[in-house]
């Protein structure tokens, strides 16, 4: 066969070759087909990028989720009629801002890169034996060697498996068709899973209960239910944990291990989100402002809790006594007053506490640490609340007023003592 036979439908079929020359990860997809009227969209427009430092902070579950999202972006571009070359294996490195990513390959591992390449397709190459159409001469030659039992390219990045897959596809045994756009693909494991997602299937099945999930990360979280929803090795802990990242944070709280450290003051934190929030204190950033009183906050959680002061909403209620709280953590601490549970014990003297912050403050009595220092006089304290009260000596602020006589006080405890003089209590 020396020319295109349009009656056999060879030309309309999209050429998908697993042997096209690999390009650098994230190469922009710049051209539509010649008859397209839409503006060009690049892979960079939909890509999610990480620096090597940020990538190192992700756990395995988060990396699997990244793979799933990038695959979906990749296939969405394909579905709007882009040409691309699909390799049979995925690069095992994150798509980053400062990395060449010219690394090796591992099968069926975490997907972390997408490779796409623009082609002009000014000239089509036809296999006269089977009618397969190729975009480049290199692909056709590789295809012919595979058909003739020639060089299998052992030692290159694709290997025998890719030759076999391509050979099967070239003789009409397409492994799958992407129905939304009619494209034909030779499947990799990752692509096979993604096609199931696009077709509404849930490829990740729980072996315990049979429930299906679209993403591996969702299945990983679900598995925590079957192992008791509590992976924390500390028996006194009441947290229900279903993910490995939450477990690491919880263990860090109990052991005192803090791996994230700020460059400005050297203070350490158990997780990156706490470090980010603390970094704003050095920059003076307060992004969330209350419209009621003008007070500003560095994070949304503190802002939302503050708003409840104005609204009076206390959604967390104690079933024992009916007392309500603005935060669930405050309710948890309160419940321990009914149960008598004090899970946090000092290893030095054995004194126990209902909350971890109480233990942390108590330990400073043994170590002599006083991290809160007054900028006016240099006096240091082991509690931030004590420093706040001390500052009022310098500012002259007395926010606590007696409703009986109008006298004001620096602390609420001083006002409480004063009120007893009016009531006659001792």
Curated annotation (Swiss-Prot):
One of its GO terms (biological process) is regulation of DNA-templated transcription. It comes from Homo sapiens (Human). One of its GO terms (molecular function) is RNA polymerase II cis-regulatory region sequence-specific DNA binding. Transmembrane segments: none annotated. Pfam families: KRAB, zf-C2H2. The lineage of its organism: Eukaryota, Metazoa, Chordata, Craniata, Vertebrata. Residues 41-120 form the KRAB domain. PROSITE patterns: KRAB, ZINC_FINGER_C2H2_1, ZINC_FINGER_C2H2_2. The gene is ZNF562. This is Zinc finger protein 562. Belongs to the krueppel C2H2-type zinc-finger protein family. A zinc finger (C2H2-type) spans 176-198, 204-226, 260-282, 288-310, 316-338, 344-366, 372-394, 400-422. May be involved in transcriptional regulation. GO terms for cellular component: nucleus. It is found in: Nucleus. Keywords: DNA-binding, Metal-binding, Nucleus, Repeat, Transcription, Transcription regulation, Zinc, Zinc-finger.
């Amino acid at each position: 066969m020396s020319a295109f036979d349009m009656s056999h439908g060879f030309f309309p079929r999209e050429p998908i070759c697993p042997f096209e020359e690999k390009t650098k990860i994230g190469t922009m997809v710049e051209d539509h087909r010649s008859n397209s009227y839409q503006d060009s969209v690049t892979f960079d427009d939909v890509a999610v990028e990480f620096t090597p430092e940020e990538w190192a902070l992700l756990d395995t579950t988060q990396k699997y989720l990244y793979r799933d999202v990038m695959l979906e972006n990749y296939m969405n571009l394909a579905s709007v009629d882009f040409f691309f070359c699909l390799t049979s294996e995925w690069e095992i490195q994150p798509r980053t801002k400062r990395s060449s990513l010219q690394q090796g390959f591992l099968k069926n591992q975490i997907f972390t890169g997408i490779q796409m390449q623009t082609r002009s397709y000014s000239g089509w190459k036809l296999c006269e034996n089977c009618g397969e159409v190729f975009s480049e001469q290199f692909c056709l030659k590789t295809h012919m060697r595979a058909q003739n039992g020639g060089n299998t390219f052992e030692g290159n990045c694709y290997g025998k498996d890719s030759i076999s897959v391509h050979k099967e596809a070239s003789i009409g045994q397409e492994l799958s068709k992407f129905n939304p756009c009619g494209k034909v693909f030779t499947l990799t494991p990752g692509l096979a899973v993604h096609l199931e997602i696009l077709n509404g299937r849930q490829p990740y099945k729980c072996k315990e209960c049979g429930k299906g999930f679209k993403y591996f990360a969702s299945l990983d979280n679900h598995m925590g239910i079957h192992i008791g929803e509590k992976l924390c090795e500390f028996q006194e802990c009441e947290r229900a944990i279903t993910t490995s990242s939450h477990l690491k944070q919880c263990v860090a709280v109990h052991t005192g291990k803090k791996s994230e450290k700020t460059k400005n003051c050297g203070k350490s934190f158990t997780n990156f989100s706490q470090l980010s929030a603390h970094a704003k204190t050095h920059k003076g950033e307060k992004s969330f402002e209350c419209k009621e009183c003008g007070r500003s906050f560095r994070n949304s959680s503190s802002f939302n809790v503050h708003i409840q002061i104005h609204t009076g909403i206390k959604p967390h209620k104690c079933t024992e006594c009916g007392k309500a709280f603005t935060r669930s953590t405050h309710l948890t601490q309160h419940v321990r007053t009914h149960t008598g549970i004090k899970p946090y014990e000092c290893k030095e003297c054995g004194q126990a506490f209902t909350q971890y912050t109480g233990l942390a403050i108590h330990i400073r009595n043994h170590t002599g640490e006083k991290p809160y220092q007054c900028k006016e006089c240099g006096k240091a304290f082991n509690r931030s609340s004590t420093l706040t009260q001390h500052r009022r000596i310098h500012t002259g602020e007395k926010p606590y007023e007696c409703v009986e006589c109008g006298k004001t006080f620096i602390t609420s405890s001083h006002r409480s003592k004063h009120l007893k003089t009016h009531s006659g209590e001792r």
